[in-house]
């Protein structure tokens, strides 16, 4: 992605933090996926539940929202917390991998700086759709 695209992704991720529902942990997380054609940015925020096992991470909210809108191929995903940089949890890494073996994952800092890793770096030797063929 070009510098302008990464900046736009950061702004969308940052904006998504305001939609976090985190009354138990007070740990707001926002995420945004970018369609493979770079034309669509779809964001999500974490949603907590009193029954903690029912919580859903921001990355999965963004991806399921995108899939429900007809998007199934992504070139990038960005994530950050209101407290700064975070990385996707294991479940989110597997969900990200479901839709792209080559996606870049941008983990943003408060100031717009970021660390970028591929999903392969975050989830090496992964299991995915091709393994079921």
Swiss-Prot record:
GO cellular component: cytosol; nucleus
Physiological role: This enzyme scavenges exogenous and endogenous cytidine and 2'-deoxycytidine for UMP synthesis.
Reported cofactor(s): Zn(2+)
Top EC category: hydrolase
Family: Belongs to the cytidine and deoxycytidylate deaminase family.
Record's protein name: Putative cytidine deaminase
UniProt-annotated binding residues for substrate: 46-48
InterPro entries: APOBEC/CMP_deaminase_Zn-bd, CMP_dCMP_dom, Cyt/Deoxycyt_deaminase, Cyt_deam_tetra, Cytidine_deaminase-like
SUPFAM superfamilies membership: Cytidine deaminase-like
Residues that, per the record, bind Zn(2+): 57, 89, 92
